[in-house]
C-alpha cells in the first residue's frame, strides 16, 4: 500500500485549517466593517442631509416626520438615550440649530422618525412644519445623553412634560423591547390638554403589553368631562406616594419645559453640568446621584 495515502491528509489539514482561519478572519472583519459603515451617523462634526420621505398630522400642532437614511440598509447609529442636532439656514444666512430625539427604534433600518410640535415663534419647529416630501434637513450626531444598560436599576421613574416625552419614550421602548431587561418603569407625563399628549397610542400599547413592568399616569391642566387621568400638575404629594424612593437601585429621569425642571428637579447648568437637584425632588430627599435631567 502506498505511503502517500497516509501522508497526504497531514499536508491538507493544516492548509484547510489555515484557509478556514483566513475565512473566519475575513468574515468577522467584514462584519466589523459592515457594522461601522451601516450607520448613517457616526459622531463628529459632519452635517448629513436627509430627505423627507413622508409626514402626517398627529394633532392640530404636531406632525410625524419620516426621513430616509443614507442607505435602506443603514441604521441611524443612535443609541439609547441619544439625540441628533438639526440645522437650517435662514433667508438672512443665519444658522438655526436645535436638538431632536427620534421616536423610532434605534435598530430601525432605512428611515428615522421624529414627532415635532410646532411652537409659536419656534424657528426650527416652524421650519419642520413647512417641509414637503423630498425636502432635506441637515442632521449630525449622535449626542449621547445617558447610555442605558439593561438592569442598571431595579426601578426607574420617568417624569416628562410636553415634547420632553421623546427621550423618555426612547428609554421606555428600549427597556421593554428587551425581554432580559427587568427594570420596572413608572412614567408620569404632563400636558396642557388631552390633544397635547404625544405618541399616546405607542405609550398605551407598551403599558398594555407590559402590565407587570410599566405603569403610566397622564396629567392634563385642562381636562374634558370624559378624562380618566390626573388633572393639574405633577406635584409633591403625588410624587411622594408614587416614586420608588432615592436609592442606588433606582433613578429618576426628567425632561420637559423650563417650568417643569424649575418646580421638580432644578435646571441644568449646561449640557455637560447637571447641576444640583432642587425643587420637589430635593424636598423628597433626592440628590444628583438619584436624578438625571435630559
Swiss-Prot record:
Predominant cellular place of this UniProt entry's protein: mitochondrion
Membrane topology qualifier: Single-pass membrane protein
Signal peptide coordinates: none
Enzyme nomenclature, EC number: 1.6.2.2
Cofactor(s) in the UniProt record: FAD
UniProt binding sites for FAD: 152-187
Residues passing through the membrane, by range: 11-27
Role according to the record: May mediate the reduction of outer membrane cytochrome b5.
Name of the protein described by the UniProt record: NADH-cytochrome b5 reductase 2
Amino acid at each position: 500500500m502506498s505511503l502517500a495515502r497516509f501522508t497526504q491528509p497531514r499536508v491538507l489539514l493544516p492548509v484547510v485549517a489555515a484557509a478556514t482561519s483566513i475565512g473566519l478572519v475575513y468574515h468577522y472583519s467584514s462584519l466589523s466593517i459592515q457594522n461601522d459603515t451601516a450607520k448613517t451617523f457616526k459622531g463628529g462634526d459632519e452635517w448629513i442631509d436627509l430627505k423627507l420621505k413622508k409626514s402626517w398630522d398627529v394633532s392640530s400642532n404636531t406632525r410625524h416626520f419620516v426621513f430616509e437614511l443614507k442607505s435602506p440598509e443603514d441604521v441611524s447609529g443612535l443609541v439609547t438615550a441619544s439625540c441628533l442636532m438639526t440645522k437650517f439656514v435662514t433667508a438672512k444666512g443665519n444658522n438655526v440649530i436645535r436638538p431632536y430625539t427620534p421616536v423610532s427604534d434605534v435598530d430601525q433600518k432605512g428611515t428615522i422618525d421624529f414627532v415635532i410640535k410646532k411652537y409659536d415663534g419656534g424657528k426650527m419647529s416652524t421650519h419642520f412644519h413647512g417641509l414637503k416630501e423630498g425636502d432635506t434637513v441637515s442632521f449630525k450626531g449622535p449626542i449621547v445623553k445617558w447610555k442605558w444598560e439593561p438592569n442598571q436599576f431595579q426601578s426607574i421613574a420617568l417624569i416628562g412634560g410636553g415634547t420632553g416625552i421623546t427621550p423618555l419614550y426612547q428609554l421606555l421602548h428600549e427597556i421593554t423591547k428587551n425581554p432580559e431587561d427587568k427594570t420596572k418603569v413608572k412614567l408620569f407625563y404632563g400636558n396642557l390638554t388631552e390633544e397635547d399628549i404625544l405618541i399616546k397610542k405607542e405609550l398605551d400599547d407598551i403599558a398594555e403589553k407590559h402590565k407587570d413592568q410599566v405603569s403610566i399616569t397622564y396629567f392634563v391642566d385642562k381636562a374634558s368631562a370624559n378624562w380618566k387621568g390626573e388633572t393639574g400638575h405633577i406635584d409633591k404629594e403625588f410624587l411622594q406616594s408614587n416614586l420608588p424612593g432615592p436609592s442606588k437601585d433606582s433613578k429618576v429621569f426628567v425632561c420637559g419645559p423650563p417650568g417643569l425642571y424649575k418646580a421638580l428637579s432644578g435646571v441644568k447648568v449646561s449640557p455637560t453640568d447637571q447641576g444640583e437637584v432642587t425643587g420637589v425632588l430635593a424636598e423628597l430627599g433626592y440628590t444628583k446621584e438619584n436624578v438625571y435631567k435630559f
